[in-house]
Regions:
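Signature aromatic-anchored transmembrane alpha helix within multi-pass, membrane-resident enzymes
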Residues: 13, 64-69, 170, 257-261, ...
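Short helix- or helix-capping micro-motifs
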Residues: 172-183, 222, 226
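Membrane-lumen/periplasm interface segments of specific transmembrane helices
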Residues: 78, 92, 102-103, 249-333, ...
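Hydrophobic/aromatic-rich transmembrane helices and adjacent perimembrane loops
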Residues: 34-40, 339-387
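Extracytosolic helix-loop segments that constitute the early lumenal/periplasmic catalytic or substrate-binding loops
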Residues: 77, 95-118, 125-126
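Specific aromatic-rich, kink-prone transmembrane helix
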Residues: 157-160, 178, 189, 197-222, ...
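Transmembrane-helix motifs of polytopic, lipid-linked glycan transferases
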Residues: 142-166, 205
Length: 520
């Protein structure tokens, strides 16, 4: 006993030293505190296993509410400071800022990133719901705050689902916390803004409504899910599978899946091509299985070995592990609930684009709600077969795995990441000089800040239409833009294009390496 106590004290000392080092890394310029954080998590876990630490008695529901508010505030801070420090992008934050601004200005869902009707790329009529906010506070910050609040509001839904299934308020609060700690959720939140991710809270509350017998509310939430993006229909098909397999509501499940499939078919076959003037472009990611939705479905049914050979890769295995580990692999014990994730998982795993099967991208929005529900169901089955301590141990493992896999988020709190440096401040001074009505072609980091206008492009796209350019001269020569040249003689600047065209500009403003040009 004395030896265990001595070891516990030694681990306490190590944890204290790591904590001090972590605080130092947060204030040190350009340090990455995530490694120290992982070490601290592992040491505290080992310390708890050796001699359990006292856990204060807290009201589970109040804890969930506080955690929900804290998540919304923390991630609003992270995403806003990332944006202010030029770490957001034209695609997709700038794109959606421009779309919603155009809608709020009476121009309809138009964009110039690329220049087209927005519904010709992705069909997201849910964006109309954000228009009133843009009448009051237009801009990127509005979208980032809405996204953080939306994700946070999924936690109370998880609490209600878990309390109903587990009949344990404490475990329900742990699952709500587990949801908020999920690395996929956090990854989606910091990757600019995407209307598709609103599916996460919408589906979680649809589960709550379905289990409470609130059919009309459930249907409304599913309609909003369908409105988030055309391929969100896959999540609603999955919801239908869950109704049928998990709740034995065969007719309701079949009807839900059938309606969702019809919407997906109509959107990709007729609606989006009508706005685009050509076939639905995103099916190109599945060229190995055919050129249409029907071809892909037939490949799954008729050539399963070919499909398996395509998806049996190391990257996809890592993706599966990264999605399951933060939930303690509990979803594997909830097969009926996990079945709902299959349509969206198929979309991700069959794609030739690796971004779809990366666990921190927005493409997990259609998968994560089902994994969380399946984890709760898996915990309920585990409690029925094993002692309560065993189930709580699995949840504790899931929390540790979530903290480790989310450790990179701690880097966002390092002072150099959120406190603007001299270059960031110079950029904002130059961006303030861009005329509000100017047609602008700018390098990527500037675009999301300047998207409240009809025409904004990512340089050198749109240079023939733009009357202003905004460039970061320290990045010249532009290795990713072969053939695009820049020559300067005093206040005169010439931009040369690969096809021989030359555009002449005058310097409108410059601060450090941030250069604003006005066409002569």
């Amino acid at each position: 006993m004395t030896g265990r106590r001595a070891l516990a004290r030694a681990l306490d000392a190590i944890a204290a030293l790591l904590g001090v080092g972590l605080l130092g890394a947060l204030v040190s310029p350009y340090a990455r505190p995530e490694g120290l954080f992982v070490a601290l998590v592992l040491v505290v876990t080992l310390r708890h296993l050796l001699n359990p630490l006292p856990i204060p008695a807290l009201d589970p529901w109040r804890t969930t509410v506080v955690a929900t508010g804290a998540y919304a505030a923390i991630f609003a801070f992270i995403t806003i400071t990332r944006h202010l420090n030029l770490m957001t992008h034209a695609l997709d934050l700038g794109q959606y800022v421009q779309i919603v601004w155009n809608m709020a200005s009476g121009y309809g869902p138009r964009m110039s990133l690329p220049e087209m009707h927005a519904w010709g790329d992705h069909l997201s009529p849910i964006l109309w719901g954000l228009v009133p906010l843009f009448w009051i506070v237009p801009g990127p910050v509005t979208l980032l705050v809405v996204q953080s609040i939306a994700f946070a509001l999924g936690a109370p839904a998880v609490y209600l689902l878990a309390r109903r299934r587990l009949e344990d308020d404490g475990l329900a609060a742990l699952f709500a916390l587990l949801y908020l700690l999920n690395p996929s959720l956090q990854g989606m939140n910091v990757r600019d803004f995407h209307p598709a991710v609103l599916v996460v809270p919408l589906l979680l509350w649809a589960f709550v409504a379905a289990e409470a017998g609130r059919a009309l509310l459930c249907a409304g939430l599913l309609v909003l899910t369908l409105a988030s993006r055309e391929d969100a229909a896959l999540a609603v098909i999955g919801f239908g599978l869950w109704l049928a397999l998990g709740r034995r509501q065969w007719l309701a499940g079949a009807a839900t899946a059938a309606v969702a499939f019809a919407v997906l078919w109509a959107d990709t076959r007729w609606v989006i091509p009508a706005f685009r003037g050509e076939p639905y472009s995103h099916l190109r990611r599945y060229a190995a299985f055919g050129g249409s939705l029907l071809d892909i479905m037939l490949a799954l049914l008729l050539h399963p070995l070919h499909v398996l050979a395509q998806i049996a890769t190391r990257g996809r295995l890592v993706y599966a592990l990264a999605m399951l580990a933060p939930l303690g692999f509990l979803p594997l014990l909830g097969p009926a609930e996990l079945a709902g994730a299959l349509p969206a998982l198929a979309q991700n795993l069959l794609s030739r684009d690796p971004i779809l099967y990366h666990h921190r991208t927005q493409y997990q929005a259609f998968v994560l709600p089902f994994l969380v529900l399946a984890a709760v169901a898996g915990a309920a089955r585990l409690l029925a077969r094993r002692p309560e301590r065993f189930a709580k141990g699995v949840v504790a493992f899931a929390i540790v795995a979530s903290l480790v896999l989310s450790s990179r988020m701690l880097n966002e709190f390092a002072i150099y990441r959120w406190w603007p440096d001299a270059s960031d401040r110079a950029a904002h001074r130059v961006m303030a000089r861009v005329p509000a009505a100017a047609a602008l072609s700018a390098q990527d980091p500037y675009v999301a800040h300047l998207s409240l206008r009809p025409l904004v492009f990512v340089f050198p796209v749109g240079i023939e239409k733009a009357d202003h350019l905004l460039l970061y001269t320290a990045s010249y020569p532009w290795r990713d833009l072969p053939g695009v040249t820049m020559g300067r003689d005093g206040e005169d600047v010439v931009i040369g294009m690969p096809d021989g065209r030359r555009y002449r500009y005058a310097v409108a403003a410059q601060d450090g390496h941030h250069l604003l040009l006005r066409r002569r």
